[in-house]
């Protein structure tokens, strides 16, 4: 690699190389977008059409999801700083690329099966259905953001530490973390509704 090519490589937050991140779940490859940008912000360009949010970088989608929780509403810089600090903590604890940890956490926290209500003769009957890959990603990000808010609300522990711990445990598939536990609960309910 030439010196010019090495210096022109774009790193996320000027620290993390996105080219070495691999999505291991084959169904989610199209919907977990890993683009090379320094600061993940599309400025709302990808919200004009229905399914274009799947082209948005996964880090930006996490930041946007964190912005939708209670007291973080609309505070993008605060949520971006939270994700940056969480990525630093993840790197110190696991010695891995935090983007890979995020991708693994999203793959492990998204439920593969859910239930819907069908109406048969005035009676609601739960029916098990497979989740679409984009819904799995959206649900996983929602669970991770909810776990971050619940873990840091009315406690002394900062939100970035809660986010880092949640991502590390979800990447390992640990059922003690909120997002994986919630996924297993949804899948258990779906299994009983088959």
From Swiss-Prot:
Keywords: Ribonucleoprotein, Ribosomal protein, RNA-binding, rRNA-binding. One of its GO terms (biological process) is translation. The keyword Isomerase does not apply. GO terms for cellular component: small ribosomal subunit. It comes from the Archaea. PROSITE patterns: RIBOSOMAL_S7 (PS00052). GO terms for molecular function: rRNA binding; structural constituent of ribosome. It holds the Pfam family Ribosomal_S7. NCBIfam families: PRK04027.1, uS7_euk_arch. Belongs to the universal ribosomal protein uS7 family. Part of the 30S ribosomal subunit. One of the primary rRNA binding proteins, it binds directly to 16S rRNA where it nucleates assembly of the head domain of the 30S subunit. Is located at the subunit interface close to the decoding center. This is Small ribosomal subunit protein uS7. It comes from Methanocorpusculum labreanum (strain ATCC 43576 / DSM 4855 / Z). The gene is rps7.
């Amino acid at each position: 690699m030439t010196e010019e090519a090495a210096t022109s490589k774009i790193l996320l937050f000027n620290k993390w190389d996105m080219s070495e991140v691999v999505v291991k779940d084959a169904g989610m490859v199209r919907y977990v977008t890993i683009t090379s940008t320094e600061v993940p912000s599309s400025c709302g360009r990808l919200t004009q059409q229905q399914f274009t949010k799947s082209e948005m970088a996964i880090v930006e989608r996490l930041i946007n999801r964190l912005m939708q929780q209670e007291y973080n509403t609309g505070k993008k810089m605060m949520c971006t700083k939270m994700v940056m600090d969480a990525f630093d903590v993840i790197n110190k604890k696991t010695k891995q690329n935090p983007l890979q940890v995020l991708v693994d956490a999203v793959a492990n926290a998204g439920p593969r099966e859910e239930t819907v209500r069908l109406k048969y003769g005035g009676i609601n009957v739960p029916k098990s259905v497979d989740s679409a890959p984009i819904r799995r990603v959206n649900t996983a990000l929602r669970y991770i953001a909810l776990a971050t808010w619940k873990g840091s609300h009315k406690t002394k522990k900062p939100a970035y530490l809660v986010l880092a711990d949640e991502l590390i445990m979800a990447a390992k598939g640990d059922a003690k973390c909120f997002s994986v536990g919630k996924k297993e609960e949804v899948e258990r309910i779906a299994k009983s509704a088959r």
